[in-house]
Curated annotation (Swiss-Prot):
UniProt keyword annotation of Transmembrane present: yes
Keyword terms: Antibiotic resistance, Cell inner membrane, Cell membrane, Cell shape, Cell wall biogenesis/degradation, Hydrolase, Membrane, Peptidoglycan synthesis, Transmembrane, Transmembrane helix
Topology versus the membrane: Multi-pass membrane protein
Protein's name according to its UniProt entry: Undecaprenyl-diphosphatase 2
Length: 276
């Protein structure tokens, strides 16, 4: 990748990680369609992706900083017990994070290697679109609840939905948004919980790879460019979070429809072009 491609990839990562349209899917499709020379096995690609993940994680931590201060403070004040609203929500986040974290550690490399072709991505992206459209229908059939009313079993099920993102084309935020709607949350509460769940997963994805970088020596990575890409990814992720939280608060009817139709259109049209 040259510098321009790297910066554009950072924009794609920062935006599509939070929008329910699959960052991994777009990270496969767009470079392929634009004929970018990306070698994912090159030693420089790992530090590049680490910086993008850390940039996105930093954006989420900054945007939800008050939430995290309240959650951690409430949890510590309660001595780890779910005896106040903040401590209880902290436990809900922990319960929702564990399933995806464990599945990611066990299956991530195998699944991503198995389904890394553009054809597989297009199929999963179209299915992601159908999932989002189904989520809107679920919302019409379920009464809206506050996040404080979510059960621990519900949090675990919503968190498990993140595992769908191991398949390139399915969206982490999309799956958790739909799962939240299925458990009676409104769009805004579902989005907030989705982003709170994503924060430790995305942060861990970056931090767990850092020790591997120490064994690569200085290499040929241009660290100035890597830092710039991390910053670009973070800025785009922050802007995306800001937009989406306001969008879901204001749009309480069929909020997922635009994203669902977009994924379905790209997936189906992309598959048709492959057949022609």
């Amino acid at each position: 990748m040259n510098a321009i491609e790297a910066l554009l990839f950072a924009v794609i990562q920062g935006v599509s990680e939070l929008f329910p349209v699959s960052s991994l899917g777009h990270g496969v499709l767009i470079p392929d369609w634009l004929h970018w020379s990306i070698n994912r096995t090159h030693p420089d690609f790992l530090p590049f992706m680490v910086m993008l993940h850390l940039g996105t994680a930093a954006a989420l931590l900054i945007y939800f900083r008050r939430d995290w201060v309240d959650l951690i403070g409430g949890w510590l004040k309660a001595g780890g017990r779910a005896s106040n609203p903040h401590a209880r929500l902290m436990w809900l986040v922990i319960a929702g994070t564990l399933p995806a974290g464990l599945l990611g550690l066990l299956l991530e490399k195998q699944l991503r290697a198995l389904f890394a072709s553009t054809t597989a991505v297009l199929v999963f992206l179209a299915l992601n679109g159908l999932l989002l459209l189904w989520g809107d229908k679920l919302k019409k059939k379920t009464a809206s609840h506050e996040l404080s009313e979510l059960s621990f079993a519900g949090a675990i099920k919503i968190g498990a939905g993140q595992a769908l993102a191991l398949l390139p084309g399915f969206s982490r935020s999309g799956a958790t948004l739909v799962a939240g709607l299925a458990h009676g949350l409104d769009y805004a509460s579902s989005a907030r919980f989705s982003f709170l769940l994503a924060t430790p997963i995305i942060t861990a994805a970056g931090l767990l790879e850092i020790p591997k970088l120490a064994h690569r020596g200085n290499g040929s990575a241009e660290w100035g460019l890597l830092l710039a890409c991390g910053a670009v990814s973070g800025l785009c992720a922050y802007a995306s979070t800001w937009f989406l939280m306001r969008y879901f608060k204001k749009t309480e009817i069929e909020s997922l429809r635009p994203f669902g139709f977009y994924c379905l259109l790209v997936g189906v049209v992309g598959l048709l072009f492959k057949l022609v």
